[in-house]
Amino acid sequence: YSKGCDSRELFMNYNIAQTEDFEKYLNKYDVIHLDMQWILMDAGAPERISGYINKNVISELADLYKDIDLRDQKTLYGALSVINSMTNNKFVIIIDEWDVLIRYEAANSSVQEEYINFLRGMFKGSEPTKYIELAFLTGILPIKKLKTQSALNNFDEYTMLYAGRLSPYIGFTEDEVRDICDRYGRDFTQVERWYDGYMLGDYHVYNPRAVVNYMLHG
């Protein structure tokens, strides 16, 4: 998705390049990637996370959009809204381990509430759809509920138990493993016996790391 590089050659030899939407989304967006594990360490304390994200990402956006005055913006979603109103640009947001604070600060309700409110400001309701093209969050826990309301009720959740349409992409499918075995001269029946994998919907899926290790090291 990122405008920050030309990734066409990276994907040209893969199946994704044959899909009808490949050109539509390729390198069309500014991508904001937040790794919450690293941010927690850099921020210095759990209660500083929201402020740390707002301050640092707005600073980077100000460097990127020099013609737009973001000095009065205190929140990331406010800055994104201003940029969109001036340019019509939309963003892709990726948050790795979104639930770090929920897991690490399970007993600290004030920190959790502040963080959930930050996420709600970013994603809840119809306003964010004006400036966010796609938001993708990874984590262990399901979407957190704050009191009686879901903090992020406009997300689709995919898990190992309910992978839905993402089933063939969460691991190597059986057809992909057969193809890899052919390329590396390995016996598929051996892989099938040792790394039986798991069923996601209609797909028999194998752990990519286990398969790759076997191909490289036997």
Regions found by a protein language model. Name each.
Residues Y1-G218:
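Phosphate-binding site recognition
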